[in-house]
A protein has these predicted regions:
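A cytosolic small-molecule/anion-sensing beta-strand core signal
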Residues: 220
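Nucleotide/phosphate-binding catalytic cleft detector across ATP-hydrolyzing
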Residues: 1-16, 20-75, 79-206, 223-225, ...
Protein backbone atom coordinates (compact mmCIF):
# COMPACT_ATOMS: atom_id res chain seq x y z
CA UNK A 1 0.00 0.00 0.00
CA UNK A 2 1.60 3.21 -1.21
CA UNK A 3 1.16 6.36 0.84
CA UNK A 4 0.46 8.13 -2.45
CA UNK A 5 -2.82 6.17 -2.61
CA UNK A 6 -3.86 7.23 0.90
CA UNK A 7 -6.12 10.21 1.64
CA UNK A 8 -6.78 11.30 5.23
CA UNK A 9 -9.51 13.72 6.27
CA UNK A 10 -9.90 15.40 9.64
CA UNK A 11 -13.31 16.48 10.95
CA UNK A 12 -13.06 18.61 14.10
CA UNK A 13 -16.52 18.80 15.64
CA UNK A 14 -18.01 19.94 18.92
CA UNK A 15 -18.45 16.45 20.38
CA UNK A 16 -16.00 14.33 18.37
CA UNK A 17 -12.81 14.65 16.37
CA UNK A 18 -12.58 12.06 13.60
CA UNK A 19 -9.69 11.06 11.37
CA UNK A 20 -10.84 9.07 8.33
CA UNK A 21 -8.34 7.16 6.19
CA UNK A 22 -9.28 6.27 2.63
CA UNK A 23 -7.46 4.42 -0.14
CA UNK A 24 -7.72 5.03 -3.87
CA UNK A 25 -7.78 1.73 -5.73
CA UNK A 26 -8.44 1.61 -9.50
CA UNK A 27 -10.45 4.81 -9.34
CA UNK A 28 -12.50 3.67 -6.35
CA UNK A 29 -12.27 5.29 -2.93
CA UNK A 30 -12.53 2.93 0.03
CA UNK A 31 -12.48 3.85 3.73
CA UNK A 32 -9.96 1.62 5.48
CA UNK A 33 -9.71 3.23 8.91
CA UNK A 34 -11.49 5.64 11.24
CA UNK A 35 -10.12 7.18 14.41
CA UNK A 36 -12.39 8.98 16.86
CA UNK A 37 -11.81 10.91 20.07
CA UNK A 38 -13.90 13.05 22.39
CA UNK A 39 -13.61 16.68 21.37
CA UNK A 40 -12.26 19.04 24.00
CA UNK A 41 -11.71 22.74 23.41
CA UNK A 42 -14.56 23.18 20.91
CA UNK A 43 -17.77 25.04 21.71
CA UNK A 44 -20.59 25.45 19.18
CA UNK A 45 -18.19 24.55 16.39
CA UNK A 46 -15.55 27.14 17.37
CA UNK A 47 -12.12 26.54 18.90
CA UNK A 48 -11.95 27.95 22.44
CA UNK A 49 -8.88 26.09 23.76
CA UNK A 50 -5.89 25.39 21.49
CA UNK A 51 -4.10 22.84 23.71
CA UNK A 52 -7.21 20.75 24.38
CA UNK A 53 -8.11 20.75 20.69
CA UNK A 54 -4.58 19.67 19.74
CA UNK A 55 -4.77 16.75 22.17
CA UNK A 56 -8.15 15.68 20.78
CA UNK A 57 -6.74 15.75 17.24
CA UNK A 58 -3.74 13.72 18.31
CA UNK A 59 -5.95 11.14 20.04
CA UNK A 60 -8.12 10.67 16.95
CA UNK A 61 -5.13 10.42 14.60
CA UNK A 62 -3.33 7.95 16.88
CA UNK A 63 -6.47 5.80 16.94
CA UNK A 64 -6.68 5.79 13.13
CA UNK A 65 -2.96 5.03 12.77
CA UNK A 66 -3.23 1.99 15.05
CA UNK A 67 -6.20 0.69 13.10
CA UNK A 68 -4.45 0.81 9.72
CA UNK A 69 -0.81 0.48 10.74
CA UNK A 70 0.53 3.57 8.97
CA UNK A 71 1.82 6.97 10.06
CA UNK A 72 -0.35 9.94 9.13
CA UNK A 73 1.57 13.07 8.17
CA UNK A 74 -0.78 14.97 5.85
CA UNK A 75 -4.52 15.63 6.09
CA UNK A 76 -7.43 17.37 4.45
CA UNK A 77 -9.24 19.47 7.06
CA UNK A 78 -12.94 20.27 7.05
CA UNK A 79 -14.03 23.81 7.84
CA UNK A 80 -17.38 25.51 8.44
CA UNK A 81 -18.86 28.29 10.55
CA UNK A 82 -20.64 31.62 10.35
CA UNK A 83 -17.41 33.27 9.21
CA UNK A 84 -17.67 31.45 5.86
CA UNK A 85 -18.81 33.57 2.91
CA UNK A 86 -19.51 32.90 -0.77
CA UNK A 87 -19.22 35.34 -3.66
CA UNK A 88 -19.38 35.05 -7.43
CA UNK A 89 -16.34 35.64 -9.61
CA UNK A 90 -15.20 35.38 -13.21
CA UNK A 91 -11.83 34.42 -14.64
CA UNK A 92 -10.48 34.47 -18.19
CA UNK A 93 -7.18 33.33 -19.78
CA UNK A 94 -5.78 32.57 -23.21
CA UNK A 95 -5.18 28.87 -23.93
CA UNK A 96 -1.43 28.32 -23.66
CA UNK A 97 -0.84 25.26 -25.88
CA UNK A 98 0.21 25.90 -29.46
CA UNK A 99 -2.31 23.32 -30.70
CA UNK A 100 -5.02 25.18 -28.69
CA UNK A 101 -5.95 22.06 -26.72
CA UNK A 102 -7.08 22.95 -23.20
CA UNK A 103 -5.08 21.17 -20.51
CA UNK A 104 -4.87 20.98 -16.74
CA UNK A 105 -2.51 23.96 -16.62
CA UNK A 106 -5.08 26.16 -18.39
CA UNK A 107 -7.76 25.17 -15.87
CA UNK A 108 -5.44 25.97 -12.98
CA UNK A 109 -4.62 29.37 -14.49
CA UNK A 110 -8.25 30.36 -15.10
CA UNK A 111 -9.21 29.38 -11.54
CA UNK A 112 -6.31 31.49 -10.27
CA UNK A 113 -7.57 34.37 -12.40
CA UNK A 114 -10.98 34.04 -10.73
CA UNK A 115 -9.27 34.51 -7.35
CA UNK A 116 -8.23 38.05 -8.28
CA UNK A 117 -10.96 39.81 -6.32
CA UNK A 118 -11.09 42.37 -3.53
CA UNK A 119 -11.03 40.56 -0.18
CA UNK A 120 -11.25 42.46 3.15
CA UNK A 121 -8.02 42.30 5.19
CA UNK A 122 -9.67 40.21 7.92
CA UNK A 123 -10.70 37.50 5.43
CA UNK A 124 -8.91 35.11 3.09
CA UNK A 125 -9.80 32.80 0.21
CA UNK A 126 -10.31 29.15 1.12
CA UNK A 127 -11.41 27.64 -2.19
CA UNK A 128 -12.62 28.34 -5.71
CA UNK A 129 -15.57 26.26 -6.94
CA UNK A 130 -16.16 26.26 -10.69
CA UNK A 131 -19.83 26.59 -11.71
CA UNK A 132 -19.23 26.43 -15.45
CA UNK A 133 -16.50 26.95 -18.02
CA UNK A 134 -16.84 28.93 -21.24
CA UNK A 135 -14.71 28.10 -24.30
CA UNK A 136 -14.70 30.76 -27.04
CA UNK A 137 -18.20 31.86 -25.98
CA UNK A 138 -19.64 28.34 -25.67
CA UNK A 139 -21.25 28.15 -22.22
CA UNK A 140 -22.32 25.30 -19.94
CA UNK A 141 -19.08 23.30 -20.06
CA UNK A 142 -18.28 21.31 -16.91
CA UNK A 143 -14.90 19.88 -17.95
CA UNK A 144 -13.06 21.67 -20.80
CA UNK A 145 -9.98 19.42 -20.78
CA UNK A 146 -9.16 18.15 -24.26
CA UNK A 147 -11.35 20.73 -25.99
CA UNK A 148 -9.95 23.08 -28.63
CA UNK A 149 -10.19 26.82 -28.10
CA UNK A 150 -8.40 30.14 -27.82
CA UNK A 151 -10.16 31.74 -24.84
CA UNK A 152 -11.06 29.93 -21.61
CA UNK A 153 -13.37 31.49 -19.02
CA UNK A 154 -14.83 30.28 -15.74
CA UNK A 155 -17.85 31.32 -13.70
CA UNK A 156 -16.89 30.46 -10.14
CA UNK A 157 -17.90 30.73 -6.50
CA UNK A 158 -15.17 32.05 -4.20
CA UNK A 159 -15.24 30.61 -0.67
CA UNK A 160 -13.79 32.97 1.92
CA UNK A 161 -13.40 32.77 5.68
CA UNK A 162 -12.29 34.82 8.65
CA UNK A 163 -8.54 34.81 9.17
CA UNK A 164 -8.75 34.31 12.94
CA UNK A 165 -10.83 31.08 12.95
CA UNK A 166 -8.89 29.75 9.95
CA UNK A 167 -5.49 30.39 11.54
CA UNK A 168 -6.62 28.91 14.87
CA UNK A 169 -7.72 25.77 13.04
CA UNK A 170 -4.45 25.55 11.10
CA UNK A 171 -2.47 26.14 14.28
CA UNK A 172 -4.19 23.26 16.08
CA UNK A 173 -3.57 20.83 13.23
CA UNK A 174 0.07 21.86 12.83
CA UNK A 175 0.70 21.62 16.59
CA UNK A 176 -0.70 18.10 16.32
CA UNK A 177 2.27 17.22 14.10
CA UNK A 178 0.34 17.21 10.81
CA UNK A 179 0.71 18.99 7.47
CA UNK A 180 -2.44 20.41 5.90
CA UNK A 181 -2.99 19.28 2.32
CA UNK A 182 -6.02 21.51 1.85
CA UNK A 183 -9.05 23.02 3.57
CA UNK A 184 -12.43 21.63 2.50
CA UNK A 185 -15.75 23.42 3.05
CA UNK A 186 -17.77 20.86 5.05
CA UNK A 187 -21.21 21.72 3.57
CA UNK A 188 -19.74 21.37 0.08
CA UNK A 189 -18.26 17.96 0.89
CA UNK A 190 -21.50 16.84 2.53
CA UNK A 191 -23.41 17.85 -0.58
CA UNK A 192 -21.13 15.81 -2.81
CA UNK A 193 -21.80 12.72 -0.68
CA UNK A 194 -25.49 13.21 0.16
CA UNK A 195 -27.08 14.77 -2.92
CA UNK A 196 -27.46 13.38 -6.42
CA UNK A 197 -26.53 15.38 -9.49
CA UNK A 198 -30.21 16.04 -10.25
CA UNK A 199 -30.90 17.19 -6.68
CA UNK A 200 -28.09 19.73 -6.89
CA UNK A 201 -29.24 20.94 -10.31
CA UNK A 202 -32.95 21.25 -9.46
CA UNK A 203 -32.28 22.85 -6.07
CA UNK A 204 -31.89 21.38 -2.60
CA UNK A 205 -31.35 22.47 0.99
CA UNK A 206 -28.95 20.29 2.97
CA UNK A 207 -29.14 20.43 6.78
CA UNK A 208 -26.28 18.83 8.74
CA UNK A 209 -27.03 18.73 12.47
CA UNK A 210 -23.94 18.38 14.63
CA UNK A 211 -23.60 18.31 18.39
CA UNK A 212 -23.02 22.02 18.91
CA UNK A 213 -23.95 23.61 15.58
CA UNK A 214 -26.01 23.03 12.45
CA UNK A 215 -24.77 23.65 8.91
CA UNK A 216 -27.31 24.66 6.28
CA UNK A 217 -26.34 24.72 2.59
CA UNK A 218 -28.36 25.57 -0.52
CA UNK A 219 -27.48 23.92 -3.84
CA UNK A 220 -28.80 25.17 -7.16
CA UNK A 221 -27.81 24.64 -10.79
CA UNK A 222 -25.31 22.00 -9.69
CA UNK A 223 -23.32 24.01 -7.17
CA UNK A 224 -23.47 25.51 -3.70
CA UNK A 225 -24.96 29.02 -3.67
CA UNK A 226 -25.35 29.77 0.04
CA UNK A 227 -24.33 28.38 3.41
CA UNK A 228 -24.86 29.30 7.03
CA UNK A 229 -24.07 27.85 10.44
CA UNK A 230 -26.57 27.98 13.31
CA UNK A 231 -25.15 27.86 16.86
CA UNK A 232 -27.53 25.07 17.90
CA UNK A 233 -27.22 21.31 17.55
CA UNK A 234 -28.00 17.92 19.01
CA UNK A 235 -26.60 18.83 22.42
CA UNK A 236 -29.44 21.32 22.85
CA UNK A 237 -32.00 18.53 22.34
CA UNK A 238 -30.15 16.36 24.85
CA UNK A 239 -30.06 19.16 27.42
CA UNK A 240 -33.77 19.89 26.94
CA UNK A 241 -34.62 16.22 27.51
CA UNK A 242 -32.40 16.09 30.60
CA UNK A 243 -34.03 19.21 31.99
CA UNK A 244 -37.58 18.15 31.16
CA UNK A 245 -37.23 14.62 32.55
CA UNK A 246 -34.96 15.60 35.44
CA UNK A 247 -32.41 13.00 34.37
CA UNK A 248 -28.67 12.73 33.70
CA UNK A 249 -27.24 13.88 30.38
CA UNK A 250 -26.07 10.34 29.50
CA UNK A 251 -29.60 9.01 29.98
CA UNK A 252 -31.06 11.89 27.98
CA UNK A 253 -28.67 11.09 25.12
CA UNK A 254 -29.97 7.51 25.03
CA UNK A 255 -33.57 8.76 25.02
CA UNK A 256 -32.78 11.07 22.09
Amino acid sequence: MSNNDIIVSLDIGTSKVRAIIGEMNNGTFNIIGVGSADSEGIRKGAIVDIDQTVQSIRNAVDHAERMVGIQITEVYVGISGNHIGLQNSHGVVAVSNEDREIGEEDIERVLKAAEVIAVPPEREIIDVVAKQYVVDGLEGIQDPRGMIGVRLEVEATIVTGGKTPIHNLLRCVEKGGLRIKDLVLLPLGAGQLSLSKDEKVMGSVLVDIGAGSTNVAIFQEGTIVATSTLPIGGEFVTNDIAYGLRTLTDQAEKVK
